[in-house]
Amino acid sequence: MSTRYIAGSAVALVTPFRKNNTIDTDALKKLVQFHIEAGTDIIIPCGTTGESPTLTSDEQFRIIRIVSEEADGKIMVAAGAGTNATAHAVELAKNAEKAGASAILSVAPYYNKPSQEGFYQHFRHIAEAVSVPIIVYNVPGRTGSNLSASTILRLARDFANIAAVKEASDNMNQIMELLEERPENFSVMTGEDMLILPFMAMGGDGVISVAANQIPSTVKQLVIAAKQGNLDEARALNRKYRRLFKMNFIESNPVPVKYCLSLMGMIEENYRLPLVPLSDENKAVLKKEMEFLGLI
């Protein structure tokens, strides 16, 4: 029987900032409680949606510690802890574990474009440095290189704590290969809200979602409906929220979703450069959709 540890609806959590660019710890705690109440399965701080490239190592540790303490065992915390320098990625992973994370999300090295063997050795060093489960994050659109299915499967077979992949390549052939060839206890999660329905229908385990920031209970409902084969319900939810899924990327993530959360009164609308606020035109479009969905 499968004992997959990483599954269901996971939120790629935003990092709330104050106007002076410091971390808004009160808003951060509020977000954690929001997801506990909504039934979100996994909360992921310090990922791309959390503006991790703009966070110092100390800030990442502090955020993970706050989220873990606020979660208090009621929700799994899988902390973003990746970068493109292997030694630094190992350090971030160790710090995330020390800060209380139940698991780690580690992005494939970006910019330096390693070979597949380089990818393997990168994640080998991380896996050997920590004891918590690791989610390997494949996002070629941001990293510039694809972590192949064969390399992901090799890692999954060789290291017991490499427990899952967040697959955001949009390559359906690669996704199918992972789902068909994976070890029994290895989870395959999509990183695309637009693909939840087909991904779950193919046998996927869940989603690491941007839209779960705004509509956590709905995303979980969609995942469950698709997983259980309730396709009429899943199609209806997908049809209703598809525009929002798309609009969350009308400009660079997490700018649109943070604007939405500010409309919902959850956070202040603040970003760290080089991210800047939405254009007025896109604000109007997104606000109209939020009103249409009854979210504000």
Curated annotation (Swiss-Prot):
Recorded GO MF terms: 4-hydroxy-tetrahydrodipicolinate synthase activity
Q: Does the keyword Lyase apply?
A: yes
Report one GO cellular component.
Answer: cytosol
Q: Where is this site: Part of a proton relay during catalysis?
A: 48, 111
Q: Where in the cell is it found?
A: Cytoplasm
Keywords from the UniProt entry = Amino-acid biosynthesis, Cytoplasm, Diaminopimelate biosynthesis, Lyase, Lysine biosynthesis, Schiff base
A GO BP entry = diaminopimelate biosynthetic process
Summary of subunit composition and partner proteins: Homotetramer; dimer of dimers.
Q: What is this protein called?
A: 4-hydroxy-tetrahydrodipicolinate synthase
Q: Which organism is it from?
A: Chlorobium phaeobacteroides (strain DSM 266 / SMG 266 / 2430)
Q: Which gene encodes it?
A: dapA
